[in-house]
Amino acid sequence: MKKHLLFLGPPGAGKGTQAALLSAANSYLHLSTGELLRKEIDLDTDLGKQVKDIMNRGELVSDQLVLEIVKKNLDKDNNGWILDGYPRNLSQVNSLNDVLININQPLEIVFYLDIPDEVLIKRLLIRGRKDDNEKTIKTRLKIYKETTEPLIEYYKDLALLENIKADGDLKTISADIKQKMACR
């Protein structure tokens, strides 16, 4: 079974939910960049102190710093891993590829959670986070389409991409992911 996976998709597509379900079922590390950054801050590590300082200034954490934190977690003994929310752009893809080659853990499947914008907007509004209003959601989708969507073609060209219809119910989406993993 494939053990080195990546979940791509727009905000609210269900990446974190599906990655968590799959990692729990297979004892894989679930590496969500947001959670990894918060963990470093909570543990008060040197990296965490840098991240906290950057975030307190309202700035974005650099690609290099995020990569260091991801690499630190990939280096651990594991039964496999799932990346969720990283990489987000082609520059990050290239840096990640170098790390994965170095640790001999190549990416094996990229699941693209495909969902129509109107379904996504409705889902996010129902979710009800305080930053989930229609204007903010549309801005996040625009940024996603500009920076992250090009990764879909990149991974498709490498024959790593599996398209998952993500506008269905949780069980149907999970079953589709498991079925596509079994066929690889």
Swiss-Prot record:
Compartments in which it is found: Cytoplasm
First and last residue of the signal peptide: none
UniProt-listed GO biological process terms: AMP salvage
Annotated binding of ATP, by residue: G12, A13, G14, K15, G16, T17, R127, G168
Annotated EC: 2.7.4.3
Species this chain originates from: Prochlorococcus marinus subsp. pastoris (strain CCMP1986 / NIES-2087 / MED4)
GO molecular function terms listed in the Swiss-Prot or TrEMBL record: adenylate kinase activity; ATP binding
GO cellular component, one term: cytoplasm
Region of interest (LID), ranges: 126-132
Metabolic or biological pathway: Purine metabolism; AMP biosynthesis via salvage pathway; AMP from ADP: step 1/1
Assembly: Monomer.
Protein name as it appears in the record: Adenylate kinase
A Pfam family of this chain: ADK
Region of interest: NMP: 32-61
Family per similarity comment: Belongs to the adenylate kinase family.
Entry-linked InterPro entries: Adenylat/UMP-CMP_kin, Adenylat_kinase_CS, P-loop_NTPase
Keyword terms of this UniProt record: ATP-binding, Cytoplasm, Kinase, Nucleotide biosynthesis, Nucleotide-binding, Transferase
Domain of life: Bacteria
Catalytic reactions of this protein: AMP + ATP = 2 ADP
Comment field on protein domains: Consists of three domains, a large central CORE domain and two small peripheral domains, NMPbind and LID, which undergo movements during catalysis. The LID domain closes over the site of phosphoryl transfer upon ATP binding. Assembling and dissambling the active center during each catalytic cycle provides an effective means to prevent ATP hydrolysis.
Annotated positions binding AMP: T33, R38, E59, L60, V61, G85, Y86, P87, R88, Q92, R129, R140
Protein task: Catalyzes the reversible transfer of the terminal phosphate group between ATP and AMP. Plays an important role in cellular energy homeostasis and in adenine nucleotide metabolism.
Gene3D superfamilies: P-loop containing nucleotide triphosphate hydrolases
